[in-house]
Amino acid sequence: MELDSENKLLKTGLVIVATLVIAKLIFSFFTSDSKKKRLPPTLKAWPPLVGSLIKFLKGPIIMLREEYPKLGSVFTVNLVHKKITFLIGPEVSAHFFKASESDLSQQEVYQFNVPTFGPGVVFDVDYSVRQEQFRFFTEALRVNKLKGYVDMMVTEAEDYFSKWGESGEVDIKVELERLIILTASRCLLGREVRDQLFDDVSALFHDLDNGMLPISVLFPYLPIPAHRRRDRAREKLSEIFAKIIGSRKRSGKTENDMLQCFIESKYKDGRQTTESEVTGLLIAALFAGQHTSSITSTWTGAYLMRYKEYFSAALDEQKNLIAKHGDKIDHDILSEMDVLYRCIKEALRLHPPLIMLMRASHSDFSVTARDGKTYDIPKGHIVATSPAFANRLPHIFKDPDTYDPERFSPGREEDKAAGAFSYIAFGGGRHGCLGEPFAYLQIKAIWSHLLRNFELELVSPFPEIDWNAMVVGVKGNVMVRYKRRQLS
């Protein structure tokens, strides 16, 4: 009897599931975008309904490598609850980068950042307020501010590497991660954090960082231990920065750092930023730059040590600058480092830390692919592009998988020859990375010091890509043998 009851329940369950599936298919047929003409091709995968989701979850880049040759530069992936339309390449991605927020919005797709950044900032506010907050970032990253930050970057690099011995082996990835957070603490979070609270604040940021998991994208408020630690860390950071902000205001003391810029920032209506907003903006700034800078610094060094011709070219550039300026390094001298700039830019082309950029479509629009076909992208789709894939398109970059910094040299400039949005390691258009100049200066300050003061050799195998990280980085150890020297 019990077995019969279980069989009946199983059959009933199967009927219910089958009914729901059929209902969804019927609903999709009558409400689908298929009535529209010129829809992009759709990724087909087995089993139906969930096959595309399974393929996507195995890795967006793996999926793009498989489907781009078959489907082209515009295609849709059905993730059951959402449809993502990919726009790959400058011919079709211009609207992605240039569209207004009312047409293509960041807010919905990046809501998972809100628990980390906190209330009242960035993706927790409407576009008009977010634009004002981005203005605060822009003002904090003006050239006159950057010149002061460079002095701090150089000092931090000198102090950090002075602790290395005459020779030895280090994991350069770990070393650069530590130096980047020290530098960011000084330039962004303020002297108080750097000098007195660095260990405490670093530990709290570590908990914030570890609270951003793949599942956080779908369920940012899920009550799991990592999210609870994230929330406690966010609350504690608010308390720490409230004390620092209050102390600065009471004493009238000012500093040349991003914290001070945010404290002094005012909205158009005259309202000053609150302590909570300042904390949230600082967290957003650190998250935007910390991982990307340390990852790019590591890749840059790994490639320089792998390809001796580029290492020699970067070294010769430093020798020429020393002959011209002496040992001094400042903002203007860093700006003269064109060879090192191209080496960093090429590392970023091959390894942009953010592999996908997304927007939510609020209106229909059309794009025309390289082959002349025009496609209609319906309202309601998530629209995406991939710097990691687009930066390796062979019709834009010659031998795209080869490290070749000279592709950006005068006379070649492959990124410019192919037109706008050909190189998108820092995004572009309305939502281009505000911290791009800061990042280049920071990485140049580090590597110019290393080139001038150390002989370097990569002793571990060339690193692989860590596709499992939220911000795609360098997998495993990157062991480097060093020996002190004085470049002249």
Curated annotation (Swiss-Prot):
Compartment(s) of residence: Membrane
Residue stretches spanning the membrane: 12-32
Topology relative to the membrane: Single-pass membrane protein
Catalysed reaction equations from the record: a 14alpha-methyl steroid + 3 reduced [NADPH--hemoprotein reductase] + 3 O2 = a Delta(14) steroid + formate + 3 oxidized [NADPH--hemoprotein reductase] + 4 H2O + 4 H(+)
UniProt KW Lipid metabolism keyword: yes
EC number: 1.14.14.154
GO BP terms, alphabetized: methylation; sterol biosynthetic process
Function: Involved in sterol biosynthesis. Catalyzes the 14-alpha demethylation of obtusifoliol to 4 alpha-methyl-5 alpha-ergosta-8,14,24(28)-trien-3 beta-ol.
Family: Belongs to the cytochrome P450 family.
Protein known as: Sterol 14-demethylase
Species this chain originates from: Arabidopsis thaliana (Mouse-ear cress)
